[in-house]
From Swiss-Prot:
Recorded phenotype for the gene knockout or disruption: Abnormal spore maturation in presence of cw27-encoded poison. Sensitises cells to cw27-encoded poison; simultaneous disruption of cw9 enhances sensitivity.
Assigned protein family: Belongs to the WTF family.
Assembly: Homomer. Forms protein aggregates. The two isoforms can interact with each other and with themselves. High sequence similarity is required for their interaction.
Protein name: Meiotic driver cw27
Stored InterPro entries: WTF
Entry superkingdom: Eukaryota
rRNA-binding in keyword set: no
Biased composition (Basic and acidic residues): 11-29
GO cellular component assignments: ascus epiplasm; endoplasmic reticulum; membrane; vacuole
Regions that span the bilayer: 108-128, 145-165, 172-192, 208-228, 245-265, 272-292, 336-356
Residue ranges of the region described as Disordered: 1-42, 74-103
A biological process from GO: meiotic drive
Length: 375
Protein backbone atom coordinates (compact mmCIF):
# COMPACT_ATOMS: atom_id res chain seq x y z
CA UNK A 1 0.00 0.00 0.00
CA UNK A 2 1.12 3.36 -0.89
CA UNK A 3 1.63 5.81 1.87
CA UNK A 4 -0.40 8.90 1.29
CA UNK A 5 1.49 12.01 2.08
CA UNK A 6 -0.52 15.14 2.37
CA UNK A 7 1.27 18.30 1.47
CA UNK A 8 2.15 20.33 4.49
CA UNK A 9 2.22 24.09 4.57
CA UNK A 10 4.74 26.01 6.54
CA UNK A 11 3.93 28.80 8.95
CA UNK A 12 4.94 31.27 6.26
CA UNK A 13 2.26 29.82 3.93
CA UNK A 14 -0.37 30.24 6.60
CA UNK A 15 0.78 33.80 7.15
CA UNK A 16 0.49 34.53 3.43
CA UNK A 17 -3.01 33.04 3.42
CA UNK A 18 -3.95 35.39 6.22
CA UNK A 19 -2.74 38.33 4.21
CA UNK A 20 -5.38 37.90 1.50
CA UNK A 21 -3.29 35.32 -0.39
CA UNK A 22 -1.02 37.94 -1.91
CA UNK A 23 0.88 36.50 -4.89
CA UNK A 24 4.17 37.89 -6.08
CA UNK A 25 3.82 38.42 -9.82
CA UNK A 26 7.54 37.94 -10.35
CA UNK A 27 7.84 34.58 -8.54
CA UNK A 28 4.43 33.15 -9.37
CA UNK A 29 1.94 31.39 -7.09
CA UNK A 30 2.97 29.86 -3.82
CA UNK A 31 4.37 26.34 -4.24
CA UNK A 32 3.39 23.50 -1.95
CA UNK A 33 5.93 22.28 0.50
CA UNK A 34 6.67 18.56 0.42
CA UNK A 35 8.04 17.41 3.74
CA UNK A 36 9.19 14.06 2.34
CA UNK A 37 11.93 15.06 -0.03
CA UNK A 38 12.39 18.61 1.10
CA UNK A 39 12.88 19.66 -2.48
CA UNK A 40 10.13 22.22 -2.38
CA UNK A 41 11.00 25.07 -0.07
CA UNK A 42 8.63 27.45 1.69
CA UNK A 43 7.30 30.32 -0.43
CA UNK A 44 9.58 33.14 -1.42
CA UNK A 45 12.50 31.81 0.54
CA UNK A 46 15.84 31.35 -1.09
CA UNK A 47 18.26 28.67 0.20
CA UNK A 48 16.17 28.21 3.34
CA UNK A 49 17.03 25.31 5.60
CA UNK A 50 14.36 24.74 8.21
CA UNK A 51 16.80 22.84 10.36
CA UNK A 52 19.00 25.91 10.81
CA UNK A 53 17.10 28.60 12.74
CA UNK A 54 19.87 31.10 12.08
CA UNK A 55 19.42 30.83 8.32
CA UNK A 56 15.68 31.00 8.76
CA UNK A 57 16.03 34.30 10.56
CA UNK A 58 18.17 35.66 7.72
CA UNK A 59 15.67 34.48 5.12
CA UNK A 60 12.76 36.06 6.96
CA UNK A 61 14.71 39.30 7.10
CA UNK A 62 15.29 39.16 3.33
CA UNK A 63 11.66 38.21 2.74
CA UNK A 64 10.28 41.37 4.25
CA UNK A 65 13.10 43.58 2.97
CA UNK A 66 13.80 45.03 6.35
CA UNK A 67 16.07 47.96 6.78
CA UNK A 68 16.79 50.26 9.63
CA UNK A 69 14.05 52.74 8.80
CA UNK A 70 10.99 50.52 8.09
CA UNK A 71 8.89 47.95 9.92
CA UNK A 72 7.09 45.04 8.26
CA UNK A 73 3.49 45.73 7.29
CA UNK A 74 0.61 43.90 8.96
CA UNK A 75 2.73 43.13 12.03
CA UNK A 76 2.62 44.51 15.46
CA UNK A 77 5.89 46.12 16.40
CA UNK A 78 5.96 44.54 19.83
CA UNK A 79 4.97 41.04 18.64
CA UNK A 80 7.65 40.19 16.08
CA UNK A 81 11.19 40.58 17.36
CA UNK A 82 13.84 38.86 15.24
CA UNK A 83 17.49 39.39 16.01
CA UNK A 84 20.40 38.42 13.89
CA UNK A 85 24.12 38.66 14.31
CA UNK A 86 25.06 39.53 10.74
CA UNK A 87 21.93 41.35 9.63
CA UNK A 88 20.61 43.88 12.13
CA UNK A 89 16.81 44.10 12.07
CA UNK A 90 15.06 47.28 12.97
CA UNK A 91 14.56 48.23 16.54
CA UNK A 92 10.85 47.82 16.87
CA UNK A 93 10.70 48.75 20.51
CA UNK A 94 10.88 52.49 20.77
CA UNK A 95 10.98 54.31 24.04
CA UNK A 96 10.08 57.94 24.20
CA UNK A 97 11.85 59.52 27.10
CA UNK A 98 10.61 63.08 27.30
CA UNK A 99 12.96 65.38 29.09
CA UNK A 100 10.04 67.52 30.24
CA UNK A 101 7.04 69.36 28.93
CA UNK A 102 7.68 72.81 27.45
CA UNK A 103 5.87 75.62 29.17
CA UNK A 104 4.41 78.05 26.65
CA UNK A 105 3.08 80.38 29.29
CA UNK A 106 4.40 83.90 29.46
CA UNK A 107 6.99 84.88 32.07
CA UNK A 108 5.70 85.75 35.48
CA UNK A 109 6.77 89.41 35.47
CA UNK A 110 5.28 90.14 32.04
CA UNK A 111 2.05 88.44 33.03
CA UNK A 112 1.89 90.43 36.26
CA UNK A 113 2.71 93.71 34.53
CA UNK A 114 0.08 93.35 31.81
CA UNK A 115 -2.58 92.20 34.28
CA UNK A 116 -1.81 95.11 36.59
CA UNK A 117 -1.91 97.54 33.65
CA UNK A 118 -5.55 96.65 33.05
CA UNK A 119 -6.32 97.66 36.65
CA UNK A 120 -4.54 100.98 36.16
CA UNK A 121 -6.51 101.68 33.00
CA UNK A 122 -9.71 100.73 34.82
CA UNK A 123 -9.05 103.02 37.78
CA UNK A 124 -7.35 105.94 36.03
CA UNK A 125 -10.57 107.72 34.87
CA UNK A 126 -12.12 107.59 38.34
CA UNK A 127 -8.96 108.81 40.06
CA UNK A 128 -8.55 111.65 37.57
CA UNK A 129 -12.18 112.66 38.03
CA UNK A 130 -11.87 112.70 41.82
CA UNK A 131 -8.65 114.69 41.63
CA UNK A 132 -10.29 117.14 39.24
CA UNK A 133 -13.23 117.61 41.65
CA UNK A 134 -10.83 117.75 44.61
CA UNK A 135 -12.86 115.05 46.33
CA UNK A 136 -10.32 112.26 46.63
CA UNK A 137 -10.89 110.66 50.09
CA UNK A 138 -12.49 113.85 51.40
CA UNK A 139 -15.74 113.91 53.38
CA UNK A 140 -16.72 110.38 52.43
CA UNK A 141 -19.93 109.00 53.88
CA UNK A 142 -21.41 105.53 53.94
CA UNK A 143 -22.52 105.69 50.33
CA UNK A 144 -19.12 106.86 49.14
CA UNK A 145 -17.26 104.14 51.04
CA UNK A 146 -19.72 101.56 49.68
CA UNK A 147 -18.91 102.69 46.18
CA UNK A 148 -15.19 102.53 46.97
CA UNK A 149 -15.60 98.95 48.24
CA UNK A 150 -17.56 97.96 45.17
CA UNK A 151 -14.90 99.57 43.01
CA UNK A 152 -12.11 97.68 44.78
CA UNK A 153 -14.01 94.41 44.42
CA UNK A 154 -14.47 95.07 40.72
CA UNK A 155 -10.76 95.79 40.38
CA UNK A 156 -9.91 92.55 42.18
CA UNK A 157 -12.24 90.57 39.91
CA UNK A 158 -10.73 92.17 36.82
CA UNK A 159 -7.21 91.42 38.05
CA UNK A 160 -8.11 87.79 38.80
CA UNK A 161 -9.75 87.36 35.43
CA UNK A 162 -6.75 88.94 33.69
CA UNK A 163 -4.38 86.65 35.58
CA UNK A 164 -6.26 83.38 35.15
CA UNK A 165 -7.30 83.87 31.55
CA UNK A 166 -4.17 85.69 30.48
CA UNK A 167 -3.48 83.57 27.40
CA UNK A 168 -7.09 83.76 26.20
CA UNK A 169 -7.64 87.49 26.41
CA UNK A 170 -4.18 88.36 25.11
CA UNK A 171 -4.84 86.20 22.04
CA UNK A 172 -8.21 87.92 21.67
CA UNK A 173 -6.53 91.32 21.89
CA UNK A 174 -3.94 90.29 19.29
CA UNK A 175 -6.64 89.07 16.92
CA UNK A 176 -8.62 92.28 17.45
CA UNK A 177 -5.58 94.47 16.85
CA UNK A 178 -4.69 92.57 13.68
CA UNK A 179 -8.28 92.86 12.47
CA UNK A 180 -8.38 96.60 13.17
CA UNK A 181 -5.03 97.06 11.43
CA UNK A 182 -6.35 95.25 8.37
CA UNK A 183 -9.50 97.40 8.43
CA UNK A 184 -7.41 100.57 8.67
CA UNK A 185 -5.20 99.36 5.83
CA UNK A 186 -8.18 98.60 3.60
CA UNK A 187 -9.78 101.95 4.48
CA UNK A 188 -6.56 103.84 3.77
CA UNK A 189 -6.16 102.10 0.41
CA UNK A 190 -9.78 102.90 -0.50
CA UNK A 191 -9.37 106.54 0.51
CA UNK A 192 -6.13 106.78 -1.44
CA UNK A 193 -7.87 105.44 -4.53
CA UNK A 194 -10.74 107.91 -4.06
CA UNK A 195 -8.33 110.82 -3.59
CA UNK A 196 -6.41 109.71 -6.67
CA UNK A 197 -9.59 109.62 -8.77
CA UNK A 198 -10.71 113.01 -7.43
CA UNK A 199 -7.25 114.50 -8.00
CA UNK A 200 -7.21 113.24 -11.59
CA UNK A 201 -10.65 114.74 -12.15
CA UNK A 202 -9.64 118.05 -10.60
CA UNK A 203 -6.42 118.08 -12.57
CA UNK A 204 -8.37 117.65 -15.80
CA UNK A 205 -10.52 120.69 -14.98
CA UNK A 206 -7.89 122.69 -13.10
CA UNK A 207 -8.05 125.72 -15.40
CA UNK A 208 -11.82 126.03 -15.13
CA UNK A 209 -11.67 125.63 -11.36
CA UNK A 210 -8.92 128.23 -11.01
CA UNK A 211 -10.92 130.74 -13.01
CA UNK A 212 -14.16 130.01 -11.12
CA UNK A 213 -12.48 130.32 -7.72
CA UNK A 214 -10.71 133.49 -8.84
CA UNK A 215 -14.05 135.04 -9.89
CA UNK A 216 -15.67 134.03 -6.59
CA UNK A 217 -12.79 135.48 -4.61
CA UNK A 218 -13.02 138.64 -6.67
CA UNK A 219 -16.72 138.98 -5.83
CA UNK A 220 -16.03 138.38 -2.13
CA UNK A 221 -13.32 141.04 -2.07
CA UNK A 222 -15.53 143.53 -3.91
CA UNK A 223 -18.29 142.96 -1.35
CA UNK A 224 -15.73 143.33 1.42
CA UNK A 225 -14.38 146.62 0.07
CA UNK A 226 -17.92 147.87 -0.56
CA UNK A 227 -18.92 147.18 3.04
CA UNK A 228 -15.82 148.95 4.29
CA UNK A 229 -16.54 151.92 2.03
CA UNK A 230 -20.13 152.22 3.26
CA UNK A 231 -19.03 151.94 6.86
CA UNK A 232 -21.08 148.82 7.55
CA UNK A 233 -17.95 146.78 8.17
CA UNK A 234 -15.11 148.03 10.29
CA UNK A 235 -11.87 146.38 9.23
CA UNK A 236 -8.44 147.65 9.98
CA UNK A 237 -5.87 148.55 7.40
CA UNK A 238 -3.79 145.42 7.90
CA UNK A 239 -6.66 143.11 6.95
CA UNK A 240 -7.49 145.03 3.79
CA UNK A 241 -3.84 145.27 2.75
CA UNK A 242 -3.40 141.51 3.28
CA UNK A 243 -6.25 140.64 0.91
CA UNK A 244 -3.78 139.77 -1.81
CA UNK A 245 -1.86 137.50 0.55
CA UNK A 246 -5.04 135.72 1.59
CA UNK A 247 -5.97 135.20 -2.03
CA UNK A 248 -2.49 133.93 -2.83
CA UNK A 249 -2.68 131.41 0.02
CA UNK A 250 -6.11 130.30 -1.17
CA UNK A 251 -4.79 129.73 -4.66
CA UNK A 252 -1.83 127.85 -3.23
CA UNK A 253 -4.18 125.45 -1.42
CA UNK A 254 -6.30 124.98 -4.52
CA UNK A 255 -3.26 124.50 -6.72
CA UNK A 256 -1.83 121.88 -4.35
CA UNK A 257 -4.99 119.84 -4.97
CA UNK A 258 -5.47 120.56 -8.65
CA UNK A 259 -1.83 120.51 -9.69
CA UNK A 260 0.31 117.38 -9.29
CA UNK A 261 3.03 117.29 -6.70
CA UNK A 262 5.80 117.56 -9.28
CA UNK A 263 4.54 121.02 -10.30
CA UNK A 264 3.95 122.25 -6.73
CA UNK A 265 7.45 123.68 -6.53
CA UNK A 266 6.69 125.77 -9.58
CA UNK A 267 3.54 127.03 -7.85
CA UNK A 268 5.52 127.94 -4.73
CA UNK A 269 8.18 129.79 -6.69
CA UNK A 270 5.48 131.61 -8.64
CA UNK A 271 3.75 132.61 -5.42
CA UNK A 272 6.98 133.96 -3.93
CA UNK A 273 7.60 135.99 -7.06
CA UNK A 274 4.03 137.31 -6.92
CA UNK A 275 4.51 138.34 -3.30
CA UNK A 276 7.73 140.11 -4.25
CA UNK A 277 5.90 142.03 -6.95
CA UNK A 278 3.19 142.78 -4.36
CA UNK A 279 5.75 144.53 -2.22
CA UNK A 280 7.07 146.60 -5.11
CA UNK A 281 3.55 147.62 -6.15
CA UNK A 282 2.69 148.48 -2.54
CA UNK A 283 5.68 150.81 -2.35
CA UNK A 284 4.73 152.48 -5.64
CA UNK A 285 1.10 152.91 -4.60
CA UNK A 286 2.08 154.32 -1.22
CA UNK A 287 4.43 156.76 -2.91
CA UNK A 288 1.74 157.89 -5.35
CA UNK A 289 -0.82 158.26 -2.58
CA UNK A 290 1.59 160.35 -0.56
CA UNK A 291 2.05 162.67 -3.56
CA UNK A 292 -1.55 162.81 -4.81
CA UNK A 293 -3.52 161.69 -1.80
CA UNK A 294 -5.91 164.63 -1.92
CA UNK A 295 -7.17 163.73 -5.41
CA UNK A 296 -8.38 160.23 -4.45
CA UNK A 297 -11.95 159.82 -3.31
CA UNK A 298 -11.19 156.52 -1.55
CA UNK A 299 -8.86 156.07 1.29
CA UNK A 300 -5.36 154.96 0.59
CA UNK A 301 -5.52 151.45 2.03
CA UNK A 302 -8.61 150.65 -0.05
CA UNK A 303 -6.80 151.59 -3.24
CA UNK A 304 -3.74 149.67 -2.12
CA UNK A 305 -5.82 146.58 -1.40
CA UNK A 306 -7.55 146.71 -4.77
CA UNK A 307 -4.30 147.17 -6.69
CA UNK A 308 -2.53 144.38 -4.84
CA UNK A 309 -5.49 142.04 -5.20
CA UNK A 310 -5.94 142.45 -8.94
CA UNK A 311 -2.26 142.49 -9.84
CA UNK A 312 -1.37 139.62 -7.53
CA UNK A 313 -4.12 137.29 -8.71
CA UNK A 314 -3.63 138.23 -12.35
CA UNK A 315 0.09 137.47 -12.15
CA UNK A 316 -0.53 134.24 -10.26
CA UNK A 317 -3.09 132.99 -12.79
CA UNK A 318 -0.84 134.00 -15.64
CA UNK A 319 2.06 132.11 -14.09
CA UNK A 320 -0.11 129.00 -13.65
CA UNK A 321 -1.26 129.09 -17.27
CA UNK A 322 2.11 129.99 -18.76
CA UNK A 323 4.98 128.77 -16.59
CA UNK A 324 8.03 131.01 -16.61
CA UNK A 325 6.18 134.27 -17.33
CA UNK A 326 7.30 135.89 -14.10
CA UNK A 327 10.86 134.75 -14.68
CA UNK A 328 10.86 136.24 -18.16
CA UNK A 329 9.19 139.36 -16.78
CA UNK A 330 11.85 139.59 -14.12
CA UNK A 331 14.61 139.23 -16.67
CA UNK A 332 12.94 141.79 -18.94
CA UNK A 333 12.48 144.21 -16.06
CA UNK A 334 16.08 143.72 -15.03
CA UNK A 335 17.26 144.32 -18.58
CA UNK A 336 15.12 147.44 -18.91
CA UNK A 337 16.29 148.79 -15.58
CA UNK A 338 19.86 147.95 -16.51
CA UNK A 339 19.46 149.66 -19.86
CA UNK A 340 18.01 152.78 -18.21
CA UNK A 341 20.67 152.83 -15.53
CA UNK A 342 23.33 152.23 -18.18
CA UNK A 343 22.02 155.16 -20.22
CA UNK A 344 21.97 157.35 -17.16
CA UNK A 345 25.50 156.23 -16.29
CA UNK A 346 26.68 156.94 -19.84
CA UNK A 347 25.06 160.37 -19.75
CA UNK A 348 26.65 161.15 -16.43
CA UNK A 349 29.98 159.87 -17.76
CA UNK A 350 29.67 162.08 -20.86
CA UNK A 351 28.89 165.09 -18.75
CA UNK A 352 31.83 164.27 -16.50
CA UNK A 353 34.13 163.90 -19.50
CA UNK A 354 32.93 167.20 -20.92
CA UNK A 355 33.54 168.94 -17.65
CA UNK A 356 36.91 167.27 -17.35
CA UNK A 357 37.88 168.32 -20.89
CA UNK A 358 36.98 171.92 -20.19
CA UNK A 359 39.13 171.86 -17.10
CA UNK A 360 42.03 170.40 -19.08
CA UNK A 361 41.80 173.23 -21.62
CA UNK A 362 41.93 175.78 -18.85
CA UNK A 363 45.15 174.21 -17.50
CA UNK A 364 47.19 174.67 -20.79
CA UNK A 365 50.29 177.02 -20.28
CA UNK A 366 50.52 180.38 -22.15
CA UNK A 367 53.74 179.33 -23.99
CA UNK A 368 51.97 176.44 -25.62
CA UNK A 369 49.12 178.71 -26.68
CA UNK A 370 51.57 181.10 -28.41
CA UNK A 371 53.25 178.20 -30.25
CA UNK A 372 49.92 176.93 -31.42
CA UNK A 373 48.93 180.41 -32.63
CA UNK A 374 52.15 180.80 -34.60
CA UNK A 375 51.65 177.48 -36.28
Amino acid sequence: MKNKYYPLRSSMDELSTKNDNEIDLEKGPLPEYNSEDGSTLPPYSENLNLKDPKQMGQSITKLFNWNKSTTPPDYDENRLLITDEGNNPPNTHRENHSSGTTDNSSPFLIKLLISFTSIILFNAPAVCYLKYKDAFFKNYGAAEWTLIGFWCASSLIIFTFSWCFYETWTKAVKVTVIFLAQCIKVTAISLAKCVKVISIGLFNIRREMMIIIWILWLIICCILFGCVKDGRLNLNKALICSTCTISAVLFLIVSSVCIPIWTLWRALSGMLQVLGIHGIIALLVNGLMSLFGKHFGWRGYEIEGFVLFFTGNALFLYEMERPGVLKRMRNTTRNVIGFILGGIANAIGGIANAIGGANDNNDIPLGELEVESEV
